[in-house]
């Protein structure tokens, strides 16, 4: 299975996709270029599928990819803590998509970027 180069070296591309995947898990919607959105869709779908599995092996595989960032938006009143992106993936998103087999994301095309007219898109969790 091939992937888009996105004008970067393989290590830069992998880091960018990890960052975008983590951002999408935390914020549930991001604005990026169309090509990046299509690549991020692949990784996010895989991460949510791992979240639905929920076993130790799936948790370790997801932890190896998703950054250890705090989901600031989701403050837990009971424990007075902020969950990490990984906790949100396995606790919230896995429950939300329990009955759905794939198709967890939606890509909406928007107007081109002003500076270079790059095709832009909004990618969001359904």
Curated annotation (Swiss-Prot):
It comes from Lactococcus lactis subsp. cremoris (strain MG1363). It comes from the Bacteria. Belongs to the bacterial ribosomal protein bL17 family. This is Large ribosomal subunit protein bL17. InterPro entries: Ribosomal_bL17 (IPR000456), Ribosomal_bL17_CS (IPR047859), Ribosomal_bL17_sf (IPR036373). One of its GO terms (biological process) is translation. Part of the 50S ribosomal subunit. Contacts protein L32. Pfam families: Ribosomal_L17. GO terms for molecular function: structural constituent of ribosome. Keywords: Ribonucleoprotein, Ribosomal protein. GO terms for cellular component: cytosolic large ribosomal subunit. The keyword Ribosomal protein applies.
């Amino acid at each position: 299975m091939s992937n888009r180069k996105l004008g970067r070296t393989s290590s830069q591309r992998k880091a960018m996709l990890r960052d975008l995947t983590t951002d999408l898990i935390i914020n549930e919607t991001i604005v990026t270029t169309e090509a990046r959105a299509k690549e991020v869709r692949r990784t996010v779908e895989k991460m949510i599928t791992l979240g639905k599995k929920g076993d130790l092996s799936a948790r370790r595989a997801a932890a190896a990819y998703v950054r250890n960032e705090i989901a600031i938006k989701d403050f837990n009143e009971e424990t007075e803590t902020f969950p990490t992106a990984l906790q949100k993936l396995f606790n919230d998103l896995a429950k939300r998509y329990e009955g759905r087999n794939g198709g967890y994301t939606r890509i909406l095309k928007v107007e081109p970027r002003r500076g270079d007219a790059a095709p832009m898109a909004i990618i969001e969790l359904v």
